């Protein structure tokens, strides 16, 4: 099938249409059921991580190799000429892009992926995270996981819990789900970490229902998806952190009134916001969610590098 993602830069979720998101989700499901180990045979993909990463880098590199591609690159730029010789990001991108067919990049600077796309000489750039800005491939694996567990991406009640102010994963996933029909959001956070105003304004403009909460227990029975995030200790003094942290810990006991189909997701790593007794419940799905990153990234790479599949 022809696809509009061929040779497209993947920089942010708002730039992807509902149809493109559905195509990625469908392709990920197909690749999970039936591996295709030669989809990007003879293609070379750069995996350039200018800040440390574990899950995203390993997931991407596994995805590349499992569909037949070769990978070059680095993790943490401390030993590269960019760091040691003062080379600009734009120069690095121009050189590296001349070696490869696609360019996967994580960078601590917001907007770095967009900048890279302007200097990649037409080689598609895939944003693996640029500061607190966007992390689109995390959103793609989240969407695939939701579709896999619920059988749909329309008609869902979804709660985000914890750090909604700084968590780029919840911003991107909210924007993605807003493209679907009859989605209701529950934003559960302390006032200091509430969902940014611009996200709420986007939902208001689109006529999408959402509600703000400071406690999660009351909303759990309403949910299809409960998306937990880590409250970042470094943003609070010790006493304030201890109070906030204790209000946003999910236990198995809190899930007793949950719908049978509820799945608990988390972008990982978790610290103590989900207790280990939740792992044994049928609602826990965060480790399978992480595994799905390989399939979602396989699908994205295959679609970006092939005009038809």
From Swiss-Prot:
Biological processes, Gene Ontology terms: 'de novo' pyrimidine nucleobase biosynthetic process; 'de novo' UMP biosynthetic process; amino acid metabolic process
EC number(s) given by UniProt: 2.1.3.2
First-level EC class: transferase
Top-rank taxon: Bacteria
Binding site for L-aspartate: 85, 168, 230
Alphabetical UniProt keywords: Pyrimidine biosynthesis, Transferase
Pathway the protein acts in: Pyrimidine metabolism; UMP biosynthesis via de novo pathway; (S)-dihydroorotate from bicarbonate: step 2/3
Catalytic activity: carbamoyl phosphate + L-aspartate = N-carbamoyl-L-aspartate + phosphate + H(+)
Recorded coiled-coil stretches: none
An annotated GO cellular component: cytosol
Positions contributing to carbamoyl phosphate binding: 55-56, 106, 135, 138, 268-269
Cited Pfam families: OTCace, OTCace_N
GO molecular function, one term: aspartate carbamoyltransferase activity
PANTHER family per record: ASPARTATE CARBAMOYLTRANSFERASE, ORNITHINE CARBAMOYLTRANSFERASE, MITOCHONDRIAL
Family: Belongs to the aspartate/ornithine carbamoyltransferase superfamily. ATCase family.
Self-association state and partner proteins as the record states: Heterododecamer (2C3:3R2) of six catalytic PyrB chains organized as two trimers (C3), and six regulatory PyrI chains organized as three dimers (R2).
NCBIfam families, per database record: asp_carb_tr, PRK00856.1
Function: Catalyzes the condensation of carbamoyl phosphate and aspartate to form carbamoyl aspartate and inorganic phosphate, the committed step in the de novo pyrimidine nucleotide biosynthesis pathway.
Protein name from the UniProt record: Aspartate carbamoyltransferase catalytic subunit
């Amino acid at each position: 099938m022809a696809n509009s993602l061929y040779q497209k830069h993947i920089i942010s979720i708002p730039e992807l249409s509902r149809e493109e998101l559905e195509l990625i989700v469908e392709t990920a499901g197909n690749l999970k059921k039936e591996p295709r180990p030669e989809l990007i045979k003879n293609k070379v993909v750069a995996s350039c991580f200018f800040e440390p990463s574990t899950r995203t880098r390993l997931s991407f590199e596994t995805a590349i190799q499992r569909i037949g591609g070769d990978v070059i690159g680095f993790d943490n730029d401390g030993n590269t000429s960019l760091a040691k010789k003062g080379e600009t990001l734009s120069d690095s991108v121009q050189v590296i892009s001349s070696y490869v067919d696609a360019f996967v990049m994580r960078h601590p600077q917001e907007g770095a992926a967009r900048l890279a796309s302007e200097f990649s000489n037409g080689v598609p750039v895939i944003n693996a995270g640029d500061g607190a800005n966007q992390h689109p491939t995390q959103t793609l694996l989240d969407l695939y996981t939701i579709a896999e567990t619920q059988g749909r991406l329309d008609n869902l009640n979804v709660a985000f819990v914890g750090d909604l102010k700084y968590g780029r994963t919840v911003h991107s996933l909210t924007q993605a789900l807003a493209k679907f029909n009859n989605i209701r959001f529950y934003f559960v956070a302390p006032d200091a970490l509430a969902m940014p105003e611009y996200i709420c304004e986007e939902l208001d403009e689109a006529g999408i229902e959402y509600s703000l909460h400071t406690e999660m227990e009351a909303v759990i029975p309403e949910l299809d998806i409960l998306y937990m995030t880590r409250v970042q200790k470094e943003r609070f003094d010790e006493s304030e952190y201890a109070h906030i942290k204790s209000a946003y810990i999910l236990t198995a006991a809190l899930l007793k009134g949950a719908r049978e189909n509820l799945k608990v997701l988390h972008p990982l790593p978790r610290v103590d916001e989900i207790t280990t007794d939740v792992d044994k419940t049928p609602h826990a799905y965060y480790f399978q969610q992480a595994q799905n990153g390989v399939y979602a990234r396989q699908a994205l790479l295959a679609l970006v590098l092939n005009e038809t599949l």
